């Protein structure tokens, strides 16, 4: 549109009738131009009020939402980083606690094993001592039985030998003496 006005201005300077001719050729009537300008301003006002202004408001609202979303995303990133650090600290603490529990369990198991070993050794020693006592008792009983049997055999043998050569009173004294001797053994 600007070149048209420039051309009209040049033509008016060069030839005054040429502008009127151009205005007539293009149908430029000041009354119509004023009406068109007024109509354009009305349409522009309606468009601004009902189309452009709500669109700008929606765009600003959307920009605010996007800004709030970005801010929220940054906050969430910070919270995520903090949560990751916290979870890493919790995992590390849990690992330390688990190691401590495992070490304590090992120590308890070792103590229990040592205690059980000591108890088993004590029971074995006690069983061995009881077995030795039983063997000793059995040995004494066997010796006593053997002494009794030997004494009986000696008495019988002595009776047979002495029955032929000794008198009854000598035999009784000899039997009593032999019995005393065997009892002391």
Swiss-Prot record:
Presence of the UniProt keyword Transmembrane in the record: yes
Location of the protein in the cell: Cell inner membrane
Keyword tags: ATP synthesis, Cell inner membrane, Cell membrane, CF(0), Hydrogen ion transport, Ion transport, Membrane, Transmembrane, Transmembrane helix, Transport
One cellular-component annotation, GO: proton-transporting ATP synthase complex
One Pfam family recorded for the sequence: ATP-synt_B
Membrane topology field: Single-pass membrane protein
Residues spanning the membrane: 32-52
Entry keyword annotation includes Transmembrane helix: yes
GO molecular function annotation: proton-transporting ATP synthase activity, rotational mechanism; proton-transporting ATPase activity, rotational mechanism
Entries under InterPro entries matching the protein: ATP_synth_B-like_membr_sf (IPR028987), ATP_synth_b/b'su_bac/chlpt (IPR002146), ATP_synth_F0_bsu_bac (IPR005864), ATP_synthase_B_chain (IPR050059)
Free-text function comment from the UniProt entry: F(1)F(0) ATP synthase produces ATP from ADP in the presence of a proton or sodium gradient. F-type ATPases consist of two structural domains, F(1) containing the extramembraneous catalytic core and F(0) containing the membrane proton channel, linked together by a central stalk and a peripheral stalk. During catalysis, ATP synthesis in the catalytic domain of F(1) is coupled via a rotary mechanism of the central stalk subunits to proton translocation. Component of the F(0) channel, it forms part of the peripheral stalk, linking F(1) to F(0).
Family under the similarity heading: Belongs to the ATPase B chain family.
Subunit structure, as described in the record: F-type ATPases have 2 components, F(1) - the catalytic core - and F(0) - the membrane proton channel. F(1) has five subunits: alpha(3), beta(3), gamma(1), delta(1), epsilon(1). F(0) has three main subunits: a(1), b(2) and c(10-14). The alpha and beta chains form an alternating ring which encloses part of the gamma chain. F(1) is attached to F(0) by a central stalk formed by the gamma and epsilon chains, while a peripheral stalk is formed by the delta and b chains.
Protein name: ATP synthase subunit b
Biological classification of the source: Bacteria, Pseudomonadati, Verrucomicrobiota, Opitutia, Opitutales
